[in-house]
Amino acid sequence: MATWNSRGLRGSFLEELVNMTNDKYRSQKLAPITPVRMDKEHRQITLAYFDQRSTIDYIGAVQGIPVCFDAKECATDRFPLANVHEHQIRFMKEFEEQDGIAFLLIYFKAKDTFMYLPYAKLDEFWRRMEEGGAKHFKYEELDPAYEISTYSGTFVHYLEQIQMDLEQRDSR
């Protein structure tokens, strides 16, 4: 039986689909995106791995534009902001300040829907939470134009949403 790490097959449904999508993008020379992995074999030897938390799930470039993103799953139509950590928000903010594009890919299981959440909207939800507001956001609060559909065998085809994100930035 195939195993991953030491506890059976691990990894989320969304991450598996994103990995397959990224492999397709790489083979088509559209976007070299790679998962950010921790060296689990040596972490008990090198204490430094415990000193700094992991940042995000994926980093790379889409036709020369630096991108970083995290893949998240949500069982209901309410996404808890506790699923995103402060150090991830900070990393994404710094990445955006260097003219990169940061975002979340979210799979809403209850709706069987994939969504692209631009960093600017994530930051808006995060600030609302910090100011005492809701510690989650609802699916209905997201722009339906950022829904991701399957395209030509690509499971989580998010390149169109990156393009839309770029166009909205240019219009500001």
For the regions a protein language model found, what residue spans apply to each?
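Mg2+/Mn2+-dependent nuclease catalytic core
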Residues: 74-98
